[in-house]
């Protein structure tokens, strides 16, 4: 019998949730995703020193202002790591817009254009890039405009049905509904333990998947943020799942039989009118878990972006 990972690959597209090139080589995923926290982690890997140096030297040619150099070096480093990953994966890389732009539609669009330009200058077509944006109202509106320009987006930090519905209605290419972070919140809030089938994160992604398929939305559902392989097994059949190296390793060393759990609807019905901004904000606000986890996720990504910039600034001024 094939191992659990190989069985899973025949049902669901596996995406590596890491910036570690060696891990990506080991598990041979279709795509890869990065975020500010993963870029910060990758920047500590000695084999990546040349990518950092290249970003530093490039940034120095772009501006004489240190703050602009730091910003440019951060963007260039994220792209440099993405370019290396694209030498291995046959599909796409997701590169994230600065979390501090999560409530700035125009700023998010401008940053997306800059990242795409950097990839194109490195010989990478935009068809291999997904621009990651937080699933705020502003992020979703930015993604809608980018999609209309032919720039595909990955809407992340997605914790609620309201966010998922708004993304589909905006014509977003892909969403990353978080599983493990939803579980974390409910375990802390209730003090209970949950089986994989009852896991609130699994239930949330299943609801989103079924809604999309029932109403004929083309937006790809890519479950993210897993705490254990049980969550992953329960989402077999989801369009894609992005999984970290530790859980990929566990799946590769397991013989657990994989049975498809998510199955698309055979017939579709038309969805209702799109959510207005007021409706979105109200529905989202009614979900305390989603409100807390989105805010926390944005803050934490911004903190790690700041840590990366401190490191880059030291190198730029040394």
From Swiss-Prot:
Pfam families in alphabetical order = TAL_FSA (PF00923)
Q: Name one GO cellular component term.
A: cytosol
* Position of the signal peptide: none
Q: What is its main location?
A: cytoplasm
Q: Where in the cell is it found?
A: Cytoplasm
Gene Ontology molecular function terms on file: transaldolase activity
According to its UniProt record, which residues of this chain constitute the active site?
132 (schiff-base intermediate with substrate)
Pathway note: Carbohydrate degradation; pentose phosphate pathway; D-glyceraldehyde 3-phosphate and beta-D-fructose 6-phosphate from D-ribose 5-phosphate and D-xylulose 5-phosphate (non-oxidative stage): step 2/3
By what name is this protein known? Transaldolase
The free-text function statement in the UniProt record for this protein reads: Transaldolase is important for the balance of metabolites in the pentose-phosphate pathway.
Which GO terms fall under biological process for this protein? carbohydrate metabolic process; pentose-phosphate shunt
HAMAP family referenced in this protein's UniProt entry, alphabetically: Transaldolase_1 (MF_00492)
Question: Its gene?
Answer: tal
Q: Identify which top EC class this enzyme belongs to.
A: transferase
Tell me which PANTHER family the record gives: TRANSALDOLASE (PTHR10683:SF18)
Kindly state the subunit structure of this protein.
Homodimer.
**Mind telling me which InterPro entries this protein's record contains?**
Aldolase_TIM (IPR013785), TAL/FSA (IPR001585), Transaldolase_1 (IPR004730), Transaldolase_AS (IPR018225)
Task: Return the similarity comment.
Answer: Belongs to the transaldolase family. Type 1 subfamily.
Tree of life domain? Bacteria
**Which Gene3D superfamilies does this entry report, sorted A to Z?**
Aldolase class I
């Amino acid at each position: 019998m094939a191992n659990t990972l190989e069985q899973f690959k025949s049902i669901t597209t596996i995406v590596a949730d890491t910036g570690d090139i060696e891990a990506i080589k080991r598990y041979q995923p279709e795509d890869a995703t990065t975020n500010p926290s993963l870029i910060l982690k990758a920047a500590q890997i000695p084999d990546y020193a040349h990518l950092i140096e290249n970003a530093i030297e490039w940034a120095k040619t772009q501006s004489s202002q240190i703050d602009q150099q730091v910003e440019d070096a951060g963007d260039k480093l994220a792209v440099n790591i993405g370019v290396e990953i694209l030498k291995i994966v046959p599909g796409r890389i997701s590169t994230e817009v600065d979390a501090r732009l999560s409530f700035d539609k125009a700023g998010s669009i401008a940053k997306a254009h800059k990242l795409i330009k950097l990839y194109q200058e490195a010989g990478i077509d935009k068809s291999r890039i997904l621009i990651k944006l937080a699933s705020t109202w502003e992020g979703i509106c930015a993604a809608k405009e980018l999609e209309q320009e032919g720039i595909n987006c990955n809407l992340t930090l997605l914790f609620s049905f309201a966010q998922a519905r708004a993304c589909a209605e905006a014509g977003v290419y892909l969403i990353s509904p978080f599983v493990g972070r939803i579980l974390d919140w409910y375990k802390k809030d209730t003090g209970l333990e949950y089986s994989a089938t009852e896991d609130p994160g699994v239930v949330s992604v299943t609801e989103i998947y079924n809604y999309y398929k029932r109403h004929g939305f083309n937006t790809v559902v890519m479950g993210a943020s897993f705490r254990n392989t049980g969550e992953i097994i329960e989402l077999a059949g989801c369009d894609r799942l992005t999984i970290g190296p530790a859980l990929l390793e566990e799946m590769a060393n397991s013989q657990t039989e994989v049975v498809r759990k998510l199955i698309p609807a055979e017939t579709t019905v038309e969805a209702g009118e799109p959510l207005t901004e007021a409706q979105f904000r109200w529905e989202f606000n009614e979900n305390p878990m989603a409100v807390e986890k989105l805010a926390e996720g944005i803050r934490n990504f911004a903190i790690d972006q700041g840590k990366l910039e401190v490191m880059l600034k030291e190198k730029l001024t040394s």
